[in-house]
Amino acid sequence: MDRAKFIFVTGGVLSSLGKGISSSSIATLLQHCNYQVSILKIDPYINIDPGTMSPLEHGEVFVTSDGAETDLDIGHYERFLNRNLTRLNNFTTGQIFSSVIENERKGEYLGKTIQIVPHVTDEIKRRIKSAAKGLDFLIVEVGGTVGDMEGMFYLEAIRQLKLELGNEKVINVHVTLIPYIQTTNELKTKPTQHSVQELRRLGVTPQIILARSPKPLDKELKKKIALSCDVEQDSVIVATDTKSIYACPILFLQEGILTPIARRFNLNKLHPKMAAWNTLVEKIIAPKHKVKIGFVGKYLSLKESYKSLIEALIHAGAHLDTQVNIEWLDSENFNEKTDLEGVDAILVPGGFGERGIEGKICAIQRARLEKLPFLGICLGMQLAIVEFCRNVLGLKGANSTEFNQRCEYPVVYLIEDFMDQNHQKQVRTYNSPLGGTMRLGEYECEIMPNSLLEKAYKKPNIKERHRHRYEINPKYRQEWENKGLKVVGFGANHLIEAIELEDHPFFVGVQFHPEFTSRLQSPNPIILDFIKSALHKS
């Protein structure tokens, strides 16, 4: 931790300005200067983690290799940095409070009155320092907006850290909005000025202003912001909208963000090697080919629920010089008459609950019968089994016990005890609490030879991430396989991890979530081959 330098990223004016992408972009530039870099996300909500939050409330829950259910921004960090992060890279107010209360119960505070300062702020600082071990730089994104009640003690902890570590070890970057008033054709800086004033009132002074704006800022506006916010003019970085989030590091580099960073940290001039990155971004922005993927989901009112999967399709497309267009198909309304004209492949993602299930099953049946390339992920694979049992084997009562505990043919069921990734026995029942009771994190999968999965991964054993409670019931396996639906992937205790259909261009189901390991620089192999199959069909 001694060598680590810290860049804290806060947000002002309003939420959803792109602090996560900004943090990822800064980290990417520093990483391409051959530094050891990581990112930490602080979430100011009181939930322990987002695991039990509705996707429509929070967006996607991203699962790390060590089984943590985290904020979707952790997914951005992994995809930009092309490295695995852990539960150390995300914490919530709920976790902070739980730790402090647990320590108090153990008597670790020697009978003192427990207060926000110093006990809560000390726990925050401890976690930040712990995440910085072995690094040159730790970028810390603070969720929420300056002025929110929930974020006050995080800003206090940042103030204290800067005092403890010294100015040469800490930079504060404030992401803010420069709104454009169309009627007067003006960009307004007043919201930024007020946001910085509030931040400074709380004891934190920004050294870099990252100004989100729909239009470029001229020198006079930059000078005005610099003067009113007490930063140097080259520390006002304009972040206009880009055609791809992966173009943001290039934009920041062009805007000169590394100049104030190097100056503040007493570093030589920074020269990131971005040629390979630039090539991939060019293929995203101006691809030679196009495919259309029918995405059958039920959380379509907030597409951030499927963020990693959307990005995984973009990664595969970039490596195939292909624009992947998504045709959003609401599973609640999908039926045998739904128009699939121009759709090159069908994707059925993971999910929870009974709503929209029959529409997904119908989409799978059409992909099977119409020879459309198909990829089913987690629940998507489970429903492929249900569809096959109902419509090929004639088991009309086939279902998952998630939706009907008394179904006639429970082809998907709840395993009440299993070994977790640490080889510890876990027990779960239909009455178990929802939080943290799933099969979570990275597990090994043995791939059968001569399968589409082996062709994609090019090795007999892989590791992929899971997030589910229900498993495929092996009782009916022989009946499926006699009809051409083969099991091609096995996990520990012979759990069924992957299936594929014979005599079909591409019909694959996987119990794991391949999207969680896809990166711009290294797309997930099975998603890459899925897009290849769609491209061949188109």
UniProtKB/Swiss-Prot annotation:
This is CTP synthase. Its EC number is 6.3.4.2. One of its GO terms (cellular component) is cytosol. Pfam families: CTP_synth_N, GATase. GO terms for molecular function: ATP binding; CTP synthase activity; glutaminase activity; identical protein binding; metal ion binding. The active site is at C378, H513, E515. GO terms for biological process: 'de novo' CTP biosynthetic process; pyrimidine nucleobase biosynthetic process. Transmembrane segments: none annotated. CTPSs have evolved a hybrid strategy for distinguishing between UTP and CTP. The overlapping regions of the product feedback inhibitory and substrate sites recognize a common feature in both compounds, the triphosphate moiety. To differentiate isosteric substrate and product pyrimidine rings, an additional pocket far from the expected kinase/ligase catalytic site, specifically recognizes the cytosine and ribose portions of the product inhibitor. It is an enzyme of class 6 (ligase). Belongs to the CTP synthase family. Keywords: ATP-binding, Glutamine amidotransferase, Ligase, Magnesium, Metal-binding, Nucleotide-binding, Pyrimidine biosynthesis. Residues 292-538 form the Glutamine amidotransferase type-1 domain. It comes from Helicobacter pylori (strain J99 / ATCC 700824) (Campylobacter pylori J99).
